[in-house]
C-alpha cells in the first residue's frame, strides 16, 4: 500500500495525469493502429500454425476410395437424363429424382414451402447404427450463380446409389435436393428440426455439392465454410475436406482465389486470403450463399465443395471427396469438439486461432472507450455532476436514437427501398450545415453526446467480437473516423449577458461551480470553423452505417453493384435470419445519430467557481 501511495505521489508531482489526459486522442489512435498492425502481422512466419487433425478417429484418406471409373457410366447416364430436367417444373424434377432414389431403398419425402418451393429429401438408414445420428449430402438444383447444377445433381444421386451398397455406415445418410442453396435449403433445415415427419436423427455434418458444368473434367475445388452470424464449422471438418482434396491430387481454393494464385505461399498471398476471409466471414449470408450457410444455428458442421474449370481431373475424382469425408465422419462416436470453432485460414494448410486475432478487435473497442473518456474529461466541463441536465439530456437523446434506429430497422424490412434509405442518410449528413443558424446546442451537451456515443459503440463492439469477430472488426474499422468529428463553438461578438445555472455542483469543500451561458451576438463563421464543418460533413458521410457499408461493398467486393448490399442485408434476415442488418441499425446507427447531433453548432458555457455561501 505504501508503495502505491509513493507511486501516486510521484505521478502527481511529475504532472503525468494532465499530460495523459491531453494525449487521450493520440492514445485512442494508437490503440486503433495497434489493432490494424496486430491483424496485419499474422501472415508473417512464426505467427501462424500449420493445420492438423485434432480428432484421431476421423483418419482422412486412410482408406482407399472406391468411387472411381466403375461409377463413371452410371454417373454419365444420370447426367444425360438430368440435362433434360432443365425446363421441367420443380415438382416434375423432384418426382423423377425421388423415383430414382427409391429404386435403391431410400425413403423419400417432399417438403413443401409456399414461399420457397419444394425440397426433395431421402433418408438411407444406417445398417450398423441406431438411427440417432445422420450426415447430409445437399445438392441445390440451382447454385449461387443461378446455374443449373447438372453435375452436382448427377453426383448426388450416383453417390446415394453408391452409399446404399455399403454396409459400413453407422450414421444415417440424408440426401437433399433443394431449389437453391439459400432460402429453400434453409427452410428445409428449419423444418427438419421442427415439423418434418421423416427424419434420420441429429445431423452431425453436411456437405453441399456444386458442379454446374456439363463437362467430364474440372480443374480445382473451392471450399466454402463461412457460416451465418459469426459461426464457423469445426476446423477438423475443414481440414479433412482440404486433406482429402489434396490427397486426390486436386488444388484447393479459398474465398474465390483464382487458379493462377493457388500455388502462391508468401506473406502477401497469406495476407490476401486473410483479408478475403474476414470480408466473407463478416458478410456471410449477405453475399451469395454457397449452401453451407443454411445449416448454421443447429450445431451442424458444414462445407460446400465447388468445382471450377473444365480440364484436368474427372468428375468421379470430385465424387471421392464427399465419399471420403462421409467415411471419416462415420467414424466419430461424438459430435465435433476437439478442434477450433474460431479461426482464420491463411492458406489451405495454415491458420491462426482466436487467441492470435482477437486482440485486434479488442484494441479497436478500447480505442472507442478512450475516445469516450476523452469526450468526458478532456474539456472545461469535466467537473459537471453526473446528474446534471447535460448528462440527463444526453442519455435521453441516446434513448431516442435507439428508438429511431429500431423503427428504421423494422420499416425497411417492410419497405426495402435502398434508394430511399440512402437518400435519407445522405440528407441527414447535411443537417448540421444547413441548420447551423437555426439549431444550437450547448457545448457541454455536445461533449456528453460524444461520450455516450463512443461508450455505447465500445460496449456493442466488445459484446460482438466474441461471437462475430469479423463483423466487430469491420464496423469498428469503418466507424472509427467518427472519433475525429469535432465540436464547433459558434463565433460571437464581444458583449455577453450571463445567467447563473440552477445546478451548482460542489467540487471542493468551500467552492461551487457556477455555469454561465454565453448569450452573444453571433458573427459569421471563421475560415477555420468552415473548414472544420466541411471536415465533419465528410466524416459523417463516410461513417454513416448504410453509406459506409455500401462503399465497402463497392470497393472491396465485385459481387455488389449500386445499393445491392442494402437490399441483401434485409433479405439475409428475412431468408436466413442473418442479423447483420440489426448490427448496423441497433449497434452502429444510434452512435452515428448521437455524433450527428453533437456536430451542430454549440454555445459555450462558462464555468466559474465561487466561494460557498454560509
UniProtKB/Swiss-Prot annotation:
The keyword Membrane applies. Residues 1-19, 378-394, 486-535, 599-614 are cytoplasmic. The gene is GAA1. It is found in: Endoplasmic reticulum membrane. Component of the GPI transamidase complex. Required for a terminal step of GPI anchor attachment onto proteins. Affects endocytosis. Its main location: endoplasmic reticulum. Pfam families: Gaa1. Changing residue 87 to A: Loss of N-glycosylation. It is a multi-pass membrane protein. Forms a complex with CDC91, GPI17, GPI16 and GPI8. It comes from the Eukaryota. One of its GO terms (cellular component) is endoplasmic reticulum. One of its GO terms (biological process) is attachment of GPI anchor to protein. A motif (Prevents secretion from ER) lies at residues 610-614. This is GPI transamidase component GAA1. Pathway: Glycolipid biosynthesis; glycosylphosphatidylinositol-anchor biosynthesis. The keyword Transmembrane helix applies. The chain crosses the membrane at residues 20-40, 357-377, 395-415, 465-485, 536-556, 578-598. Glycans are attached at residue 87. Keywords: Endoplasmic reticulum, Glycoprotein, GPI-anchor biosynthesis, Membrane, Transmembrane, Transmembrane helix. Residues 41-356, 416-464, 557-577 are lumenal.
Amino acid at each position: 500500500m505504501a508503495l502505491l501511495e509513493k507511486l501516486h505521489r510521484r505521478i502527481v508531482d511529475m504532472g503525468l495525469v494532465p499530460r495523459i489526459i491531453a494525449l487521450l486522442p493520440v492514445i485512442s489512435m494508437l490503440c486503433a493502429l495497434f489493432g490494424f498492425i496486430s491483424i496485419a502481422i499474422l501472415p508473417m512466419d512464426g505467427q501462424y500454425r500449420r493445420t492438423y487433425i485434432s480428432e484421431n478417429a476421423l483418419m482422412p484418406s486412410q482408406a482407399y476410395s472406391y468411387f472411381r471409373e466403375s461409377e463413371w457410366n452410371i454417373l454419365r447416364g444420370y447426367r444425360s437424363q438430368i440435362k433434360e430436367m432443365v425446363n421441367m417444373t420443380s415438382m416434375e424434377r423432384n418426382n423423377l429424382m425421388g423415383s430414382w432414389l427409391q429404386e435403391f431403398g431410400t425413403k423419400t419425402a417432399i417438403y413443401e414451402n409456399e414461399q420457397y418451393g419444394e425440397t426433395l429429401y431421402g433418408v438411407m438408414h444406417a445398417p450398423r447404427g441406431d438411427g440417432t445420428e445422420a450426415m447430409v449430402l445437399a445438392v441445390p438444383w440451382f447454385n449461387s450463380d443461378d446455374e443449373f447444377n447438372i453435375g452436382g445433381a448427377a453426383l448426388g444421386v450416383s453417390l446415394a446409389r453408391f452409399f446404399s451398397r455399403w454396409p459400413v455406415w453407422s450414421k444415417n445418410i440424408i440426401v437433399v435436393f433443394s431449389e437453391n442453396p439459400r432460402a429453400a435449403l434453409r427452410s428445409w433445415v428449419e423444418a427438419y428440426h421442427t415439423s418434418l415427419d421423416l427424419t434420420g436423427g441429429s445431423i452431425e455434418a453436411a456437405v453441399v455439392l456444386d458442379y454446374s458444368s456439363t463437362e467430364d473434367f474440372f480443374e480445382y475445388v473451392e471450399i466454402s465454410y463461412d457460416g451465418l452470424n459469426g459461426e464457423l464449422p469445426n476446423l477438423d471438418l475443414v481440414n479433412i475436406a482440404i486433406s482429402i482434396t489434396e490427397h486426390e491430387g486436386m488444388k484447393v481454393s479459398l474465398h474465390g482465389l483464382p487458379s493462377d494464385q493457388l500455388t502462391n505461399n508468401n506473406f502477401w498471398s497469406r495476407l490476401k486470403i486473410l483479408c478475403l476471409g474476414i470480408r466473407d466471414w463478416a458478410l456471410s449470408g449477405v453475399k451469395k450463399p454457397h449452401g453451407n450457410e443454411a445449416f448454421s444455428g443447429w450445431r451442424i458442421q458444414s462445407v460446400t465443395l465447388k468445382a471450377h474449370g473444365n480440364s484436368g481431373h474427372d468428375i468421379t475424382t470430385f465424387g471421392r471427396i464427399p465419399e471420403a469425408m462421409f467415411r471419416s465422419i462415420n467414424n466419430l462416436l461424438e459430435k465435433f469438439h476437439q478442434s477450433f470453432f474460431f479461426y482464420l485460414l491463411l492458406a489451405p494448410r495454415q491458420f491462426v486461432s482466436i487467441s492470435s486475432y482477437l486482440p485486434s478487435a479488442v484494441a479497436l473497442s478500447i480505442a472507442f472507450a478512450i475516445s469516450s473518456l476523452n469526450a468526458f474529461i478532456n474539456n472545461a466541463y469535466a467537473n459537471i455532476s453526473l446528474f446534471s441536465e447535460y448528462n440527463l439530456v444526453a442519455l435521453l437523446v441516446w434513448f431516442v436514437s435507439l428508438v429511431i434506429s429500431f423503427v428504421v430497422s423494422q420499416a425497411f424490412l417492410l419497405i426495402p427501398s435502398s434508394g430511399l434509405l440512402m437518400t435519407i442518410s445522405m440528407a441527414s449528413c447535411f443537417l448540421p450545415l444547413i441548420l447551423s443558424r437555426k439549431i444550437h446546442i450547448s457545448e457541454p451537451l455536445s461533449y456528453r453526446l460524444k461520450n455516450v456515443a463512443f461508450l455505447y459503440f465500445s460496449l456493442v463492439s466488445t459484446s460482438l467480437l466474441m461471437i462475430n469477430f469479423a463483423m466487430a472488426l469491420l464496423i469498428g474499422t469503418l466507424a472509427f473516423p467518427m472519433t475525429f468529428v469535432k465540436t464547433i463553438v459558434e463565433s460571437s461578438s464581444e458583449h455577453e449577458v450571463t445567467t447563473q445555472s440552477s445546478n451548482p455542483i460542489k467540487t471542493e469543500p468551500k467552492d461551487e461551480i457556477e455555469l454561465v451561458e454565453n448569450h452573444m451576438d453571433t458573427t459569421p463563421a471563421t475560415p477555420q470553423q468552415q473548414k472544420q464543418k466541411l471536415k465533419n460533413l465528410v466524416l459523417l458521410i463516410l461513417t454513416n452505417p448504410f453509406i459506409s457499408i455500401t462503399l465497402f461493398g463497392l470497393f472491396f467486393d465485385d459481387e455488389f453493384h449500386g445499393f445491392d448490399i442494402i437490399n441483401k442485408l434485409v433479405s439475409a434476415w428475412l431468408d436466413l435470419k442473418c442479423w447483420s442488418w440489426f448490427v448496423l441499425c441497433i449497434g452502429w446507427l444510434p452512435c452515428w445519430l448521437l455524433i450527428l447531433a453533437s456536430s451542430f453548432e454549440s454555445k459555450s458555457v462558462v464555468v466559474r467557481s465561487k466561494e460557498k455561501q454560509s
